């Protein structure tokens, strides 16, 4: 299996993890406030990533300082902004609405790359975007027009749209940032920075006292 096929195979796992985050987050939010939950999630991920970075000897202080503006931006959009709106949105809308909105992200990322980064456009790309959007709608609604027509939009949906915008901005700028910093070091630094911002905001939720009582069992 060549490198390109391996990358495509790895990309197939992305929507799997995205989908799983909705179900787990919905359960977690019944016991822990949203920003506190996001802080724990990325705090744990950040610790693991720091260990991996040092294991692979990829730490480079000079590169981090040189690219700090880009790293700060992807941290604020991809970790902080996206997850604040994502977790808060789950408090006000259904996972169906949320997943439908977020699932359109690849379409808007592709359009943004074509419009702002001059990536090539072709009929094949256009058809792929249309088919992927139709596929998302069909899968989530189980092919029922009644389900699609009965969707109503509320405060939670607007929060998910804000999360979508953050995700698109992160995806478009992340590629540029990684030209100067390795993907692993970029992911580690943005996760750690994002966790710091989330932790600061979580203090206003007063939810850390509930963490010790968190249960993994269904209520």
Where on the chain are the PLM-derived regions?
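Hydrophobic transmembrane alpha-helices of multi-pass small-molecule transport proteins
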Residues: 49, 112, 121-143, 191, ...
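Loop-to-transmembrane-helix transition segments
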Residues: 6-16, 60-85, 155-163, 210-219
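Cytoplasmic-side transmembrane-helix entry/capping segments in multi-pass membrane proteins
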Residues: 66-74, 121-134, 181-190
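Glycine-/small-residue-enriched transmembrane alpha-helix faces in small-molecule transporters
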Residues: 1-39, 149-176, 196-200
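Specific alpha-helical transmembrane segments that line the substrate/conduction pathway
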Residues: 36-47, 77, 86-129
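Membrane-interface helix termini and inter-helical loops of multi-pass transporters
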Residues: 23-34, 59-61, 88-91, 140-153, ...
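Small-residue-rich packing faces within the transmembrane alpha-helices of Major Facilitator Superfamily
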Residues: 19, 43-47, 133, 168, ...
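Specific transmembrane alpha-helical segments of multi-pass solute transporters/efflux pumps
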Residues: 17, 21-22, 50-102, 138
């Amino acid at each position: 299996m060549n490198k390109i096929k391996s990358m495509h195979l790895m990309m197939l796992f992305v929507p799997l993890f995205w989908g799983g985050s909705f179900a787990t987050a919905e359960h977690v939010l019944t016991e822990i406030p949203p920003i506190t939950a996001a802080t724990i999630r990325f705090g744990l991920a950040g610790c693991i990533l720091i260990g991996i970075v040092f294991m692979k000897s990829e730490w480079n202080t000079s590169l981090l300082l040189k690219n700090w503006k880009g790293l700060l931006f992807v941290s604020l959009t991809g970790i902080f902004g996206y997850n604040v709106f994502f977790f808060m949105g789950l408090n006000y809308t259904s996972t169906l609405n949320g997943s439908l909105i977020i699932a359109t992200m690849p379409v808007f990322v592709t359009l943004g790359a074509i419009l702002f980064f001059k990536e090539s456009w072709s009929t094949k790309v256009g058809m792929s975007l249309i088919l992927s959007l139709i596929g998302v709608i069909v899968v989530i609604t189980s092919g029922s027009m009644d389900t699609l027509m009965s969707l109503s939009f509320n405060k939670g949906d607007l929060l998910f749209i804000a999360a979508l915008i953050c995700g698109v901005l992160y995806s478009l700028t992340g590629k540029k940032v990684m030209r100067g910093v390795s993907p692993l070091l970029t992911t580690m630094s943005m996760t750690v920075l994002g966790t710091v911002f989330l932790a600061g905001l979580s203090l206003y939720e007063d939810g850390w006292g509930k963490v010790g009582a968190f249960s993994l069992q269904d209520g």
